């Protein structure tokens, strides 16, 4: 009895075995799994009589498969269709497979079959699962594909053997393997063109030697003879800071101060303010370079009073007995060059074009420390007053001078008050001002070259001043005593 088929599936057709040999019997009809697995039956024979010799010759001879109980021979070829499916059950011992009938022996059109893998799961073997014989990588990557990997990927590079030299030229720092090459190199040596120099080497090395030793501006140190070496060592011993040398330098310094030679040559080469380390130190420790003040109102008042006093009155020393030598020593060496010229006020008769030109020149020549808004506002106010006043009749020159002075003072006072009111956000956030302002002017080349001569001239002037004070050449001491008594 046939097994029931699922709904929608066609029923298995009844297979009628063709007349022939017993080995060509069809499988039983009661198992539809075998019907699904087996290919269609072969076409019917053309000859009327089955089993004749011509018909048997046309069919290829296929060896019958052994029964289920016996093992196939060692050299027998097992066809894929002859293997049982993975869900087939072995027949009982007493009953032969397929009711004592063997299955069809055929060669499948496609080389697929169901087989059992070692782990128990079915594998579907097809022709494209054949072992790879060709690499899909280009030929340039042949050493890096999966089929041609080197045994040791990290192949160490072979160390090059260092050449062995038997002849050396110490001056040129070169080595040679044989005597011939060494002789050729020594024949190329040339002597230094200087008269007192005995240096000899290759032409290029001689050029470097001349640039480093004999070029103009280079210090000439001759250490060729033992006498020169001994003299050089003696000079170095004199300058070495031993205790005796330190005491000797102190005595020389005291003698110079007594004579009046106080000034020393400025070391222009150090440039302490421009170095990177000093700038970084200022950034890291701002407290050392800034002077803090408490109270913004007090600071405004102090600044306002100071500016007003500076504008109204020139600085006059309060002390009567002032040492001129001390004033010269503590004064800046460049004070005569850096004196700031006072701002000229535009007269009333000047045309507007000339006024703008002079105001622009005044802005350029003005000091950098003062705010830029104050002088501009002052000049604008003065010009406005000068434009209004020409309609009035001219007065005496003294009266004009007084009026201009008053207007200038009023304008400056107003500008200072307005400038103090306008405080920037930076000044509000940081109530500090730099204690040491950076130097805006750098020394010129001529000044640096003439530094020793300038020092000598100023020391001579200081010596003259010291002599005048000690000898009371002008009678200043007697006059000062009389004024004190009065």
Curated annotation (Swiss-Prot):
Its main location: nucleus. SMART domains: ZnF_C2H2. The gene is Nufip1. Residues 1-71 are annotated as: Disordered. Binds RNA. This is FMR1-interacting protein NUFIP1. Pfam families: NUFIP1 (PF10453). Disulfide bonds: none annotated. A motif (Bipartite nuclear localization signal) lies at residues 236-252. Keywords: Metal-binding, Nucleus, Phosphoprotein, RNA-binding, Zinc, Zinc-finger.
